[in-house]
Structure formats: C-alpha cells, structure tokens
Curated annotation (Swiss-Prot):
The gene is pnp. The lineage of its organism: Bacteria, Pseudomonadati, Campylobacterota, Epsilonproteobacteria, Campylobacterales. It comes from Aliarcobacter butzleri (strain RM4018) (Arcobacter butzleri). InterPro entries: ExoRNase_PH_dom1 (IPR001247), ExoRNase_PH_dom2 (IPR015847), ExoRNase_PH_dom2_sf (IPR036345), KH_dom (IPR004087), KH_dom_type_1 (IPR004088), KH_dom_type_1_sf (IPR036612), NA-bd_OB-fold (IPR012340), PNPase (IPR012162). This is Polyribonucleotide nucleotidyltransferase. Residues 657-724 form the S1 motif domain. GO terms for biological process: mRNA catabolic process; RNA processing. It catalyses: RNA(n+1) + phosphate = RNA(n) + a ribonucleoside 5'-diphosphate.
Length: 725
C-alpha cells in the first residue's frame, strides 16, 4: 500500500507518494506539483564495491516527450541522446547530492529521475532535485540528511522563491541554491538583461539595455534569502519523510588508509623533495613530478626491506604534499608558485590571430590558455532545440562551446564527444556573457573555446577570451566580462581565500567557486563547497576579494581592446527598412525574386515580415550595396497595400486597346500584376503574355521589368491586359 506525504511549501502544494511504483529499487518516489509528475529512483549495489577511493555515483535526468503530449522531434520517434538541459540538470543533481555520501562509500549507485508529466508553470529542475533527495533520504542507504534546491528570482526588485517559468521571464536574476538545513553545498547564479533602456548613444546609433549586474551585498542578501527557504524546506521534508523512511542498511565504509609509519617516514625524510615537486606542480596539472619522487623513495633501503609497494609510497607522498600545500597557504600565506593569496598569474592577450575567422582571442593566464573563436551567422542559423513544455521549436542564437583536449594537461588521449564537464563549463561561460549582448542584436553568434593548456580556471579563461572575441567581432556588448576562479583552505579555526587558483589548489582546497562579471558587478557565479558549509560573512569576503581580481583582469582586457584590428573575414552587414506590405514582393513567387538577388549578388538576406527590416550580408561590400539598391528599387516600384486598396475608377483612366508602358509588380501562377502609369494595377493573364504557350510566368517576366501592355477590358474596379507584342 502506498504512503503519501502532502504539504504546502512556498505557496505550492507538494505531494510525494512512496511504495507505489519501482518497488525493486532501494528508494523511489512519485513527486507531484500541479500537473508535473516526476519519478525518482535510487539503486545501490551493496554486493559489488569498487576498489578505488571515490564515490561511484551516477545521476540521470530524463525528460519523456509523452510528458507534454508530444512525439520526439526528428526522424526517429524515440528518445535518444540526452539534450543539453537534461545533461546539465543531471550535473546539478549530482553536485548537490554527492556530498551526502559518507567517505568510504564505494558501492555503485544510480539515481534516475524521469519526468512523466510536465507543467509549464513548474520548475522541473528544482522538482527533480527535491524528488531525488526524497528517494535518497527515505531509501535504505546510509544517508541521514535532506538536501533540496530552491530557485530565487528578482522581479521588480523583490526576491521571489521558486518563481514560475512565466515569472522567471520577467526576472533580472536566476539564482539556484542547494543545501541542507544547516549548510550551503552548491550555488549557480546568472543575471538576466532586461528591455529597460539605461542609455542611448546617438552618435553610435546604439541602445544600451540594463544588464542587471549584481553587487556583492545584493548577491549575499539573495543567497541568505535562499538559505532561509532551504532551512524551512529541509525541516519540512525531514519531518514529513520520517515515517516513510526505510531502515538504513549497515554497509561497510571502506577506509583507504596508509600506514602512519610510511607517511611519517616520507614526511620526515623527503619533505624538501616534495616541496621541490610542488613548485613544478604549480606549473602543470601533470602528476609526473610526484611520481618521480615516489620512484626515488621506493629505491630507498627502508622501502625495499619493508616491501612497501609503489602505490603505497605514492599515496603517502600525495598525503604529505597536501599537508605542505595547505600549511604554506594557511600559516605562511604563500602559495606553491610563490604568489600571495590575492595575486593573479601573469596574463597575455592577443586578438584576431586567425585571419580566416570572424574573430579570435588567445587568452593566457599562467599555464592556462584558451583560444576563443567567434563566428557570426544570420538569425535563422541558430541551434534549434525543443523545450518539453513548449509546443513549438525554440532557437538558440548565442552558443558557447568549450573543448578540453587531452593535450591541454599532457595526456595522450583522443578527442571524442562532449562530456558533462565540457557542457557545464561552456554553459557557465554563456551565462557570464549573454547578459551583456544587446537584446536587439538578433544575429547568431557561436563562440568556441579551445583549451590549449590547463592549470586551473579554464572556464574563466573562456569567459575572458570570449568577451574579447565578441568585441573583436563587432558584436554590441554593454561591457567586457572577466572571470576568476577562487578557492579556500580551512584548517581548524584558520582559513585563507585564494584568487585565481591553479589545479593543485583546486585539488587540495576546500572550496571552488568561479565569479564572472563586468566593472559594474557580477553576471554569473558557480560554487561547490567541499567542507560542508560556509558562513555568509566569509562568502562576502571571498566575493569582495574576487572583485579585486576581476578588476585587475578587466584593466588588462581593456588595454587589449584598444589594439583590436577587425578581421578581414568579418561579414559586412547593411540594414534598412521598407514597407512591411512590400516584403512579399521582394520575396516573389515561391521565393523566386529573393533567390535571384542572392545568386546574382552573392549575399545573404534576412527579411522581417512584421517590421519590414531588410538585412543584407556578405563578403564583398560593393555587392552588398548593389543588392540593397536592387531591393529598394523593387520596393519603391511596388505599391503598398494602402495604395492598392484605393478605389480607382479604371474607366475614367484607361480605354480599351490603349497601349501603355507598365512595370511588373508581382507574379502569380495565373499571370502577372502590372503597375500602370496612371495608377492602379492590371492583370496580365498567363495566356496573354505571349503567342507561344507559357508554362511558368517567372520564366518570361521578372519583378520590376518594364513592358508594353494593351488594355483588353476595362471595368470600373479592374482592368485586364495583354502583351502589346
């Protein structure tokens, strides 16, 4: 018999139904809000432990198209490769719940979340995390803490918990926070630009929209607001789920420990060697330096006589290395590469180094290097994708694709498909940059970040290089965006905040968070906390220190901006407007006219039927000018709907057998409409164009062509013509 927990939380009725479906799993729940129904299951293989020191957790978030009464798009009518949203949501759930697993839990575990019914007013990402938490918390796994997620929006300067999708469209903030009733574990945040104009540059003919960057105080306030909501939600969940929770299975937590005597031997005799290796590690993410030290130690008489295995020695070296790195930072306030806690590594910037690309930027910070390439295309060239709750297909016109080849960290491995990490890093960079792009700019922009070297903070190098690549491509942005990766080391009651962390500090530190923004404030943030929580006062201190680093990087980027020389491959674009009623004339029958213009002048043309905007782009300036003039001529010679609807008395203007010179206005299957010199238009039927049989009007006539026509019949409201020849 099923067990149901029902309660109201943040103004929404939530229903969790247990022991109804998927009863073979360790934990399962049907979670419902409104018309949204999500199934979350947890399965752990207690009899199949792995032999490595990590938590073998896999999370899958799956959207079923039947949940929105739709069929899968495309040729194959079955769900296949996960969408970017599904992958990113899986990653969010993983990062939120992984800290709950106790150290030494080595049993393969899979959390599966399936959307069975969708509701456009329900945030599926938040519901799915909370459903996964419910399944995990009530399962027989040794998880004794509830972790849930909340989303915070800012609508008309008011913070809102778990806004609907419709409300989020009017929000200037998208903040997603996951945590327990005591601790914050994960934060993702981006600002959203609004249509509100803050400035109009008359000389540059540009409008600057409000990008809504957040200052540090406002962001901490929003996080505190979310933390209060998390506390309330987790207390509610823990109380509600207490009666339905299964008895916890007692599993063995494997301790991957090394004999203290080995660690002491390495620490007492080889600390200086390890320190030297640490200095080299500061220049690379490769682990070869530590292995060299371990090999040297393994040849020592002590290790040989005690038959100590190489892997044990290497693990002992890693333990001592971590101790040294953390002690240097916390006690000596110096880092492995000699930097102070607030110092940023040396930066070099080059723009437009690839002559055949629209734009490019090589951004190097220490041993991290990103080559970011920008490409511009038309509005219709974006990435089409489906949103589960939308009936129509959506278009993504700004893309950031992040690639992390093995050679960037000295690994000999081939390049395959995009992984979750690469999708996540690209998505973070996109969040940081998209708010600064002019909302009226509707071209498609693709940034590709090729990480050529990596020693920490490659996603933030992508942000910096991406912002300059946008600038180098002439794309209207409100300001440059810089990003910096921050870290923290905590030892007892001491802590140290690090600016621009490298791979070594990321691995041995207690917190990794990335902050991106302009000179006005923060546009995006991502934080993962390894130490089990952070005080808001410490978080604010870290944000202010990040601001110092960001300001320094922005000053160097602005210097590099002055040296930008536009690429010769950059597409030339001319834009003008015509009467919207004449757009169809420019298009012609079945697109014949516009195809002819495109082929004749070797250009691309985008037309907006609603406002009459015409955009012509191409590689040859004269061709673009000629194409624009040609389109304007067609438009000027075509009557508007207003003119065509005038009540013209043809009997007063024309007489039968009269020959006049007219101009082809538009083509139809049955003939051509001819603009007459005294006003109005007449029909030249396909049978009257020539003595020879005409199969296709467009084969013998074209828009704008002048020809002699003879008046056959005249009536008060219409006139019939034939070719005078």
């Amino acid at each position: 018999m099923s067990k149901v927990c029902e309660f109201e939380l943040n103004g929404k009725q939530e229903i969790f139904e247990f022991e109804k479906v998927a009863k073979q799993s360790n934990g399962a729940v049907l979670a419902k809000i409104g018309n949204a129904v999500v199934l979350a299951t947890v399965v752990s293989e207690f009899d199949n432990p792995v032999s490595e020191d990590f938590t073998p957790l896999t999370v899958q978030y799956i959207e079923k198209t039947y949940a929105a009464a739709k069929l899968p798009g495309g040729f194959i009518k079955r769900e296949g490769k996960p969408s970017d949203f599904e992958t990113l949501t899986s990653r969010v759930i993983d990062r939120s719940l992984r800290p709950l697993f106790p150290k030494g839990y080595v049993y393969p575990t899979t959390i599966t979340v399936m959307v069975l019914s969708a509701d456009k007013n329900v945030d599926l990402q938040t519901l799915s995390l909370n459903a996964a938490n419910a399944a995990l918390y009530t399962s027989n796994l040794p998880i004794k803490k509830s972790v849930c997620g909340v989303r915070v929006g800012k609508i008309e300067n008011t913070l809102v918990i778990n806004p609907t999708n419709e409300q989020l469209e009017n929000s200037t903030l998208d903040l997603y926070v996951a945590g327990s009733k005591e601790e914050l574990l994960m934060i993702e945040m981006k600002t959203i630009s609004s249509s509100e104009l803050v400035e109009i540059d008359i000389e540059a003919f540009t409008k600057i929209h409000n990008t809504n960057e957040m200052d540090e105080d406002a962001l901490v306030e929003a996080i505190a607001f979310a933390q209060n909501a998390l506390k309330e939600a987790n207390l509610t969940y823990e109380k509600a789920f207490e009666e339905v929770s299964k008895e916890k299975f007692e599993v063995e937590l494997v301790k991957f420990t090394i004999e203290e005597s080995v660690i002491n031997y390495v620490r007492d005799n080889f600390s200086n060697d390890i320190k030297e290796a640490i200095k080299k590690l500061a220049k690379s993410e490769r682990a070869t330096q530590l292995k060299d030290v371990a090999k040297m130690i393994s040849k020592n008489e002590y290790c040989i006589s005690n038959e100590i295995e190489f892997n044990t020695i290497y693990e002992a070296v890693s333990v001592v290395k971590r101790e040294i790195v953390r002690a240097m930072i916390v006690n000596e306030r110096v880092r492995a590469d000699g930097r102070g806690l607030k110092d940023v590594r040396p930066i070099s910037i080059e723009t437009n180094i690839l002559p055949s690309t629209h734009s490019s930027c090589l951004f190097t910070r220490g041993e991290t290097q990103a080559l970011v390439i920008g490409t511009i295309a038309g509005p219709k060239d974006g990435q089409m994708y489906e949103v589960l709750t939308d009936k129509s297909t959506s278009m993504e016109n700004f893309m950031v694709h992040y690639n992390f080849p093995g050679f960037s960290v000295g690994e000999a491995k081939p390049m395959f498909g995009v992984g979750r990490r690469e999708l996540g890093h690209g998505n973070l960079a996109k969040k940081a940059l998209e708010a600064t792009i002019d909302k009226d700019y509707n071209e498609t922009v693709r940034l590709v970040s090729e990480i050529l070297e990596s020693n920490g903070s490659s996603s933030m190098a992508t942000v910096c290089g991406g912002s300059l690549a946008l600038k180098a491509a002439g794309i209207p942005i409100s300001d440059l965006v810089a990003g910096v990766a921050m870290g923290m080391v905590v030892e007892n009651d001491k802590y140290a905040i690090l600016t621009d962390i490298m791979g070594l500090e990321d691995h041995d530190g207690d917190m990794d968070f990335k902050v991106a923004g302009t000179s006005k404030g923060i546009t995006a943030l991502q934080m993962d906390i390894k130490l089990g929580g952070i005080e808001l006062s410490v978080l604010k201190e870290a944000l202010l220190q990040a601001k110092e680093g960001r300001t320094h990087i922005l000053s160097l980027m602005k210097d590099a901006e002055k040296d930008i020389v536009p690429s010769g491959a950059l597409p030339l674009i001319e834009q003008f407007a015509i009467d919207p009623s004449k757009i169809m004339v420019v298009i012609g029958k079945a697109g014949a006219t516009i195809k002819e213009i495109i082929e004749k002048f070797t250009v691309s043309i985008d037309l907006d039927k609603e406002n009459g905007t015409v955009k012509v782009s191409g590689g040859n300036k004269q061709n673009i000018i000629d194409a624009c003039e040609h389109i304007k001529t067609i438009s000027n010679n075509a009557p508007s709907k207003k003119d065509a609807s005038k009540n013209i008395d043809f009997e007063k203007l024309y007489s039968e057998d009269e020959v006049v010179i007219g101009k082809v206005e538009r083509l139809a299957d049955f003939g051509a409409f001819i603009l007459l010199p005294k006003g109005g238009e007449g029909l030249l039927h396909i049978s009257k164009i020539s003595k020879d049989r005409v199969k296709n009007v467009a084969d013998v006539l074209s828009i704008g062509q002048e020809l002699e026509v003879k008046v056959l019949k005249v009536k008060k409201d219409r006139i019939e013509l034939s070719s005078a020849n």
